[in-house]
Amino acid sequence: MADHGEHGVPEQQNAPPKKGLRFWLIFLAIGIATFVAALDTSIISTALPTITADLGSEELYIWIINTYLLSSTVSSAIVGQLSNIFGRRSMTTLALLIFAVGSAISGAARDTGMLLAGRTIQGLGGGSITTLSEVLVCDMVSLRERGVYAGILGAAWTLAAVVGPIMGGGFTQNVSWRWIFYINLPIAGSSLFLIVTLLRVRNPRSDTSILRRLRTIDWGGITLLTLGVTAILLSLTWAGTTHPWSSWRTIVPLILGFLGLLGFIAYEALPPEPTMPLRLFRNRTAATLFVMAFIYSLLLFWVCYFLPIYFQAVLNATPTRSAVMLFPVATTTAPAGIVAGILMTKTGRYRSFQYIGFALMTIACGLFTLLDQSTTTGEWTGYQILFGVGTGIVFTTGLPPILASLPESDVATGTATWIFMRNFGAIWGTAIPAAVFNTKANALASQTIDDPTVRGLLVNGGAYERATKAFVSSFKSRPAVMRAIRRLYVVSLREVWQVSIAFCGVGFLLCFLVKAYRLREELNTEYGMQLWRPVFKRLVCTWYLAGSANLMCT
């Protein structure tokens, strides 16, 4: 297998540092930061109705979620290059502070506008944390080892996604919805303390003036990217709900959004330090894996948003019960990712795992087409396990080969681009299946629902909005109508899963374009960990271990 690790770029080669107490405490801080950033993507779901009623948000309720999604997607893309300019430690500290400030504002919100402002600030911090966590790991361990640590961070993310809705419901019911934001302060604070106290990484530009560094920021690219993503998210938020897909209010912002992204890509050839260097996309392996990250994330959100519709509308589950019924996906993704990371570290191979991952996802989505009222618990659980294992494998084995194909100087921008593509895929992971579902539901309602009143409730996005146990069960006194409604959901969802198979197939075929690179066992980076300053070493080791004679602070 050819070694493509040399790119003609001068890099500092080091043996990976010893993994003593300092290393593990820093990694703990990174894991905590990842957990708290992921928590805010899910904790609000069960509290949203209460928040909306308390603040009188009405039709603005969707933006309580979308402002966070928008700002985190943009910040995840731009913070990689900013960390090259201002240093990893400074940007990580700033990201945690921004996230904490946004959490405090959200928790103290007195109206919807204040909450939206807080959520936007939170997203800027949360998206930055997600990218910087991966970048810091890349600076701390060799490329060969990164899969294991990526798997552990993935486990932290999955844990947050699982416990988030439960925590949100618990706080809302027993304390106050405001504590779903306030709880972030001590968690982020503990991570911030460890980062500020322990993290020391090299910054090649530490002698450059702040003004000169500010001038190197890709201001034009950031503006175009923000406008493009905002327009697309605006269109997808309106599509099928506020306005039909055929409405100019949906089509125009969508077109403008794509034009904005095309303008961003064209502009990236101009600045000396672009947010997403075009050389990343000229590399076949990196470009392919960026697309695979988009598809993987799209499919994960596809499944996690549309299986609950099946559970509630077809299997008659409550919203809380449907969240529990998603546990087979949530609890297998992280372990599968960790195992894949360990095997990748031991063997240095990743392509075979990618084939296996996408094959399992394809099989699972094919099996989802069999779901109906008669599907047993064992069957839908097994289908989810296959999908969870596949997504865990694909997630963990995605970033290391990207970085293996690029010079170490592109670690931050390559990582940021990979995470941006994941986040961008998540945006489409609800929009595409919703469009498929609503189109099929409209056709079926016209063909199979005779009652014009009931038909009116199910067309134009109504079936998607009313996919609840309460709605379907309200027709118990009219068994024929209830059977027809359940049949509408089964057939519409079957088409959703059939379309997902096509995306899985594209992901599998893209695996053939990924080259085999050597995963370097040495740590080549300009941003690696510095030796600890003696004062900090004595202070922190004493604080943690109370003067133990066997300090392992390296």
Curated annotation (Swiss-Prot):
<feature type="transmembrane region" description="Helical">
    <location>
        <begin position="179"/>
        <end position="199"/>
    </location>
</feature>
<feature type="glycosylation site" description="N-linked (GlcNAc...) asparagine">
    <location>
        <position position="283"/>
    </location>
</feature>
<dbReference type="InterPro" id="IPR036259">
    <property type="entry name" value="MFS_trans_sf"/>
</dbReference>
<keyword id="KW-0812">Transmembrane</keyword>
<feature type="transmembrane region" description="Helical">
    <location>
        <begin position="123"/>
        <end position="143"/>
    </location>
</feature>
<feature type="transmembrane region" description="Helical">
    <location>
        <begin position="417"/>
        <end position="437"/>
    </location>
</feature>
<feature type="transmembrane region" description="Helical">
    <location>
        <begin position="352"/>
        <end position="372"/>
    </location>
</feature>
<dbReference type="InterPro" id="IPR011701">
    <property type="entry name" value="MFS"/>
</dbReference>
<dbReference type="GO" id="GO:0005886">
    <property type="term" value="C:plasma membrane"/>
</dbReference>
<keyword id="KW-0325">Glycoprotein</keyword>
<keyword id="KW-0813">Transport</keyword>
<feature type="transmembrane region" description="Helical">
    <location>
        <begin position="289"/>
        <end position="309"/>
    </location>
</feature>
<feature type="transmembrane region" description="Helical">
    <location>
        <begin position="324"/>
        <end position="344"/>
    </location>
</feature>
<dbReference type="GO" id="GO:0022857">
    <property type="term" value="F:transmembrane transporter activity"/>
</dbReference>
<keyword id="KW-1133">Transmembrane helix</keyword>
<feature type="transmembrane region" description="Helical">
    <location>
        <begin position="251"/>
        <end position="271"/>
    </location>
</feature>
<dbReference type="InterPro" id="IPR020846">
    <property type="entry name" value="MFS_dom"/>
</dbReference>
<keyword id="KW-0472">Membrane</keyword>
<feature type="transmembrane region" description="Helical">
    <location>
        <begin position="24"/>
        <end position="44"/>
    </location>
</feature>
<feature type="transmembrane region" description="Helical">
    <location>
        <begin position="60"/>
        <end position="80"/>
    </location>
</feature>
<protein>
    <recommendedName>
        <fullName>Acurin A biosynthesis cluster MFS-type transporter</fullName>
    </recommendedName>
</protein>
<dbReference type="Pfam" id="PF07690">
    <property type="entry name" value="MFS_1"/>
</dbReference>
<comment type="similarity">
    <text>Belongs to the major facilitator superfamily.</text>
</comment>
<feature type="transmembrane region" description="Helical">
    <location>
        <begin position="385"/>
        <end position="405"/>
    </location>
</feature>
<feature type="glycosylation site" description="N-linked (GlcNAc...) asparagine">
    <location>
        <position position="174"/>
    </location>
</feature>
<feature type="transmembrane region" description="Helical">
    <location>
        <begin position="151"/>
        <end position="171"/>
    </location>
</feature>
<feature type="transmembrane region" description="Helical">
    <location>
        <begin position="496"/>
        <end position="516"/>
    </location>
</feature>
<feature type="transmembrane region" description="Helical">
    <location>
        <begin position="96"/>
        <end position="116"/>
    </location>
</feature>
<comment type="function">
    <text>MFS-type transporter that may have a role in the biosynthesis of acurin A, a highly reduced polyketide coupled to a serine via a peptide bond; either in extra- or intracellular transport.</text>
</comment>
<feature type="transmembrane region" description="Helical">
    <location>
        <begin position="219"/>
        <end position="239"/>
    </location>
</feature>
